[in-house]
Every structure is written in structure tokens, then in C-alpha cells.
Amino acid sequence: MAARTAFGAVCRRLWQGLGNFSVNTSKGNTAKNGGFLLSTNMKWVQFSNLHVDVPKDLTKPVITISDEPDILYKRLSVLVKGHDKAVLDSYGYFAVLAAKELGISIKVHEPPRKIERFTLLQSVHIYKKHRVQYEMRTLYRCLELEHLTGSTADVYLEYIQRNLPEGVAMEVTKTQLEQLPEHIKEPIWETLSEEKEESKS
């Protein structure tokens, strides 16, 4: 009990002493102005016996330029399929909002639904006239994104795939733009006519 009261007294003295707390800095110019101590390295702010050390020069993310050219996609087709219409509508709305935030042009259309029916016996040991019909309805949403870079497509796809709801499947089809190979750039008939002229002479 005596130790507790002694510890409480020490804590109170330390808490009251925080008001007269001072900071010594060896580097840079410091100026004290009405409860604020500004330094070139750190900023110290005091509000009612509470101080926070905040680094003044926060490191900004550095944008790196790579030598490798980015992939270009002409079209990115995302086919989402599921059994619940409300879930697909909600997910389509989410995907459109995410695309608009990234500045991507997007079109959404709804392909016709696919219905599979299975006709089975009610039980294994029963007459043929006692049957049950099961039905599986698969609904689709197709998201068409056009004119994307590879990095933008990767970021967008990762974001929408991480937030894919349960019971929903996704198929992604990418149409990539490629440079025309060197052997196709020149028309073949021009080289053939030159070879014929050389063989004649």
C-alpha cells in the first residue's frame, strides 16, 4: 500500500512537470513561440501537457521510370457469372465506380442467362412416374474496358478480384496490342518482283 502511494506521488510530479518540459536541439535553428517549438528537423507541438513529435520532412514516394515499355491492351473483357441477380447488380455497380475512379472507360452489358434443368427420380427405389426437376440458373454480367496500359489493368483487376463476392466466378480476356514484326512490315510482293528482275538479268 505504501509503495502504491509513493508511486502515485512520483507519477503526479512527473505529470505536473511535463508543463515545464523543454527540448534541447543541437542542430538547426529553433524558435519557441507560444507553446510551439519549431525545429528544422522535428516539429514539437504542446497542447495541455501533451506533445507529439512529427517529422517535418516526410519522404515522398519516388516515381521510378523503367526502361521496359508498358503493355498496351486494346480491350479487357471481364465476364462475371453467378446465381443471384442482386449480387451481380451490386458487384457491377462497384466495378463501374472503381473504373471511374481510375479514369477507365467501361461498358456493362448483360448476356442472356443460361438455364440447366436436370430431371431425376425422387428416390433410387421408386417408380419412373415419380420424378423431380432441378433447375440451375446462371446469370452473367460482361464488363468491357478499352484502351488500357498494363499497370492500370493490373491494379484494377487486383482490386475487383479481391472484392469478388462469394458464389461469383470471373473470367478475364485480354486483347493486347503488339508491334508488327519486321518480316511482315515490308510487302512480300515487292521483294518477289525484285528477285525476278535479278534472275532475268
From Swiss-Prot:
Q: Which Gene3D superfamilies match?
A: Ribosomal protein S10 domain
Keyword Ribonucleoprotein belongs to the record: yes
Q: Does the keyword Transcription apply?
A: no
Major subcellular location class: mitochondrion
In terms of InterPro entries, this protein maps to:
Ribosomal_uS10_dom, Ribosomal_uS10_dom_sf, Ribosomal_uS10m
One GO cellular component assignment for this chain's record is:
mitochondrial small ribosomal subunit
What subcellular locations does the record give?
A: Mitochondrion
Give UniProt keywords alphabetically: Mitochondrion, Ribonucleoprotein, Ribosomal protein
Query: What is one Pfam family matched by this protein?
Result: Ribosomal_S10
How does this protein assemble? Component of the mitochondrial ribosome small subunit (28S) which comprises a 12S rRNA and about 30 distinct proteins.
PANTHER family in UniProt: MITOCHONDRIAL 28S RIBOSOMAL PROTEIN S10, SMALL RIBOSOMAL SUBUNIT PROTEIN US10M
Q: Which family does it belong to?
A: Belongs to the universal ribosomal protein uS10 family.
Name of the protein described by the UniProt record = Small ribosomal subunit protein uS10m
Q: Which organism is it from?
A: Pongo abelii
Q: Which gene encodes it?
A: MRPS10
